[in-house]
Swiss-Prot record:
A biological process from GO: translation
SMART domains: GatB_Yqey (SM00845)
Alphabetized UniProt keyword annotations: ATP-binding, Ligase, Nucleotide-binding, Protein biosynthesis
UniProt-listed Gene3D superfamilies: 1.10.10.410, GatB domain, N-terminal subdomain (1.10.150.380)
Family named by the database record: Belongs to the GatB/GatE family. GatB subfamily.
Protein name per the record: Aspartyl/glutamyl-tRNA(Asn/Gln) amidotransferase subunit B
Organism name: Chlorobium luteolum (strain DSM 273 / BCRC 81028 / 2530)
Reaction catalysed by this enzyme: L-glutamyl-tRNA(Gln) + L-glutamine + ATP + H2O = L-glutaminyl-tRNA(Gln) + L-glutamate + ADP + phosphate + H(+); L-aspartyl-tRNA(Asn) + L-glutamine + ATP + H2O = L-asparaginyl-tRNA(Asn) + L-glutamate + ADP + phosphate + 2 H(+)
Pfam families per UniProt: GatB_N, GatB_Yqey
Function field: Allows the formation of correctly charged Asn-tRNA(Asn) or Gln-tRNA(Gln) through the transamidation of misacylated Asp-tRNA(Asn) or Glu-tRNA(Gln) in organisms which lack either or both of asparaginyl-tRNA or glutaminyl-tRNA synthetases. The reaction takes place in the presence of glutamine and ATP through an activated phospho-Asp-tRNA(Asn) or phospho-Glu-tRNA(Gln).
InterPro entries: Asn/Gln-tRNA_amidoTrfase_suB/E (IPR017959), Asn/Gln-tRNA_Trfase_suB/E_cat (IPR006075), Asn/Gln_amidotransferase (IPR018027), Asn/Gln_tRNA_amidoTrase-B-like (IPR003789), GatB (IPR004413), GatB_C_1 (IPR042114), GatB_Yqey_C_2 (IPR023168), Gln-tRNA_amidoTrfase_suB_CS (IPR017958)
């Protein structure tokens, strides 16, 4: 029997607010354990939560970006369960009335675009963290308690592990473009749980699902789903029954292992939080937030192709990260040439970032400086070869390209008389090659060009060199 994979994803996106969701404690990652805490975080008697307005606005931004309907009235609820790192004994979340409903994402995992529907996006607070690797004891760090999250729940529309990771990458791209999260999976800013099941091909009814946790990279999401699908297939083909449970992905062993029985919604005994008023989103807030939305990757890539005349592939790569797209546009603004700017950013800049393990935001060559370098190439002041030398020197100081060219004496030589003198010397020093060229070995033209450029240390204007050589060789 042939089976079809069915996957739905629950993604927790940690918001980059300065303070937590329901108190004024810092939400900064990496602080000493239990230093970002207050009576609200610890659920001490009499401590009352107050919702962070920025959390609501970020939820609305993501909802609008994913085509959701925004609820004018939504309710915060208590999700009740016991866990050592949850001091309150409940988590503030949303249940029956979430803030965003019925959206979608378009993804392309290599087989054309596909629509993945979203059930909901809702506001939630994070729990604390259990630490098991200090001696034989377990410690609790509650710094993360109350850090704001958005949970994005998809319909089970995903049919391959690649689709799942592509969906997750697309979602990460959107939250980063919106500026609401850094989307860092390794630090837990973006966490993904996958609900996996199999069903016979052609069946409409879903099979029994298992939930997979602890996947901290796109590659691990793919591997975990593929492993779990094969585990299900093996059980079903042997006539067994799938147990509905939560399983942990072990990246070292490349397998999932049972964690606990899968809970149902009624196990959490949701009810509206009596300490928090309903969340209201009016038309004025929606109008304001719509105006604040950025130009998203697909639209920006299309504009790059049309406005700057660059290839579709280049535009897609340049718009993967908002910061890279911003950098490119700032370069073009100074350089005035979209195609050459694209070549430099896609080539020298990205190569340097990869070699030095840098992010574009930490790159030492500001876009205005790179734009200035490209202008020098366009004006004929320097050659492409010299420009690459200047680019390397620009990474070592704050000097402009023009200042470096003047300081190092790298200006391009276009003086016909000087170039003619060098060409005459090269031809005189290589009589055999000259004779060979005149006998029809035209590929030797490149040899003469190389000799001239080497003699003039790369500073000769290639166009003038070619013209002079052509004239001398044919004379």
């Amino acid at each position: 029997m042939k089976y079809e994979l069915v996957v739905g994803l629950e993604v927790h996106c940690q918001l980059n607010t300065a303070s937590k969701a329901f108190c004024s404690c810092s939400a900064q990652f990496g602080k000493p354990a239990n230093s970002n805490v207050c009576p609200v975080c610890l659920a001490l008697p009499g401590a009352l939560p107050v919702l962070n307005r920025r959390v609501v606005e970020d939820a609305v931004k993501l909802g609008l970006a994913t085509g959701c309907a925004i609820a004018p009235h939504s309710v915060l609820a208590r999700k009740n369960y016991f866990y050592p790192d949850l001091p309150k004994g409940y988590q503030i979340s949303q249940f029956e009335e979430p803030i965003c409903i019925e959206g979608h994402l378009m993804v392309d995992a290599g087989e054309g675009e596909k629509l993945i529907r979203l059930i909901r996006i809702h506001i939630e607070e994070d729990a604390g963290k259990s630490i098991h690797d200090i001696g034989d004891d377990t410690y609790i760090d509650v710094n993360r308690c109350g850090v704001p999250l958005l949970e994005i729940v998809s319909y089970p529309d995903i049919r391959t592990a690649k689709e799942a990771s592509t969906y997750l990458q697309k979602l990460r791209q959107i939250v980063k473009y919106l500026g609401i999260s850094d989307g860092n999976m390794e630090e837990g800013s973006l966490r993904c749980d996958a609900n996996v099941s199999l069903r016979p091909v052609g069946d409409e009814e879903y099979g029994t699902r298992t939930e997979i946790k602890n996947m901290n990279s796109f590659k691990n999401v793919e591997k975990a789903i593929e492993f779990e699908a094969e585990r299900h297939r093996g059980i079903l083909e042997e006539g067994g029954t799938i147990v509905q449970e939560t399983r942990l992905w072990d990246a070292d062993k490349g397998e999932t292992r049972s964690m606990r029985g899968k809970e149902f919604a009624h196990d959490y005994r949701y009810f509206p939080d009596p300490d928090l008023v309903p969340v209201l989103v009016d038309d004025e807030m929606l109008r304001r937030i719509r105006l604040e939305l950025p130009e998203f990757p697909e639209a920006r890539a299309s504009r790059f192709v049309e406005q700057y005349g660059i290839p579709v592939y280049d535009a897609a790569v340049l718009t993967v990260e908002r910061e890279m797209a911003d950098y490119f546009e700032a370069v073009v603004e100074v350089a005035g040439d979209g195609k050459v700017s694209s070549n430099w950013v896609m080539g020298e800049v990205m190569r340097t970032l990869k070699e030095k393990y840098l992010d574009i935001t930490a790159f030492s060559v500001a876009p205005s400086r790179l734009g200035g370098l490209i202008k020098l190439i366009g004006s004929g002041a320097i050659s492409n070869t010299i420009a690459k030398q200047v680019f390397e020197l620009m990474q070592q100081s704050e000097a402009s390209a023009e200042e470096i060219v003047q300081r190092e004496g790298l200006a391009q030589v276009s003086d016909t008389g000087e170039i003619e003198r060098v060409v005459d010397e090269i031809l005189a020093a290589n009589p055999d090659q000259l004779a060979g060229y005149r006998e029809g070995k035209v590929k030797l033209f490149g040899f003469f060009v190389g000799q001239c450029m080497a003699r003039m240390k790369g500073k000769a204007n290639p166009k003038v060199v070619n013209e002079v050589l052509q004239r001398k060789l044919e004379g």
